[in-house]
C-alpha cells in the first residue's frame, strides 16, 4: 500500500494522522491520533504508518515499557499486522512472479524499505519456521528468502 492509501485507510478507521517533528520515534499513536515523523521519505512514512495502524487494531493500553513481556508481544502483533498490510505472503509471491531477484528489487516492487522487508522476513521466519506454502508456491525463509512454484 502507498502512503496515500494508508492515509485513506486510517481516515476510514477514524484515525487522525499528522506529520510532526518527532525526536525519538518515527511514529506514535495515542487514542485515535497518529503522529508520523515528517522528515522521512514517503516509503518510510508508509512503513511506519502501517505499524501504527497495526497498533490501533491490536494494542491495548500503554506498551512503552518493553521490559514487560506482554508489551513486547503486543509490539510484535502490531508489527506483524503492518507487515501483512504492506507485504504479506502473497506480496512476496507477486514480487517473485514479477521477476524480482534480490531484496532491493523486492522492496522497491512492494514500496517498502529494505530494512522493513528484512524485518518482515525475520518476523515470518519466527512465525512460520523454515517455509510456508501459499497457493501453489513454497516460500522459504531459511537460509534465505526463496520462492518456488509448485507444479
Language model features by range: what are they?
Residues 1-151:
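Active-site hotspot residues in diverse enzymes, especially metal/ion-binding acidic/histidine motifs
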Amino acid at each position: 500500500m502507498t502512503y496515500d492509501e494508508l492515509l485513506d485507510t486510517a481516515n476510514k478507521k477514524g484515525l487522525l494522522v499528522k506529520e510532526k517533528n518527532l525526536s525519538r520515534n518515527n511514529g506514535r499513536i495515542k487514542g485515535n491520533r497518529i503522529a508520523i515523523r515528517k522528515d522521512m521519505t514517503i516509503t518510510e512514512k508508509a512503513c511506519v504508518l502501517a505499524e501504527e495502524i497495526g497498533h490501533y487494531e491490536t494494542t491495548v493500553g500503554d506498551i512503552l515499557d518493553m521490559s514487560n513481556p506482554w508489551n513486547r508481544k503486543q509490539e510484535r502483533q502490531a508489527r506483524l499486522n503492518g507487515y501483512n498490510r504492506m507485504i504479506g505472503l502473497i506480496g512476496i509471491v507477486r514480487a517473485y512472479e514479477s521477476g524480482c531477484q534480490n531484496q532491493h528489487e523486492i522492496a522497491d516492487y512492494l514500496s517498502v524499505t529494505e530494512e522493513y522487508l528484512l524485518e518482515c522476513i525475520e518476523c515470518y521466519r519466527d512465525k512460520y519456521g523454515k517455509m510456508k506454502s501459499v497457493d501453489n508456491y513454497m516460500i522459504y525463509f531459511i537460509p534465505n528468502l526463496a520462492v518456488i512454484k509448485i507444479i
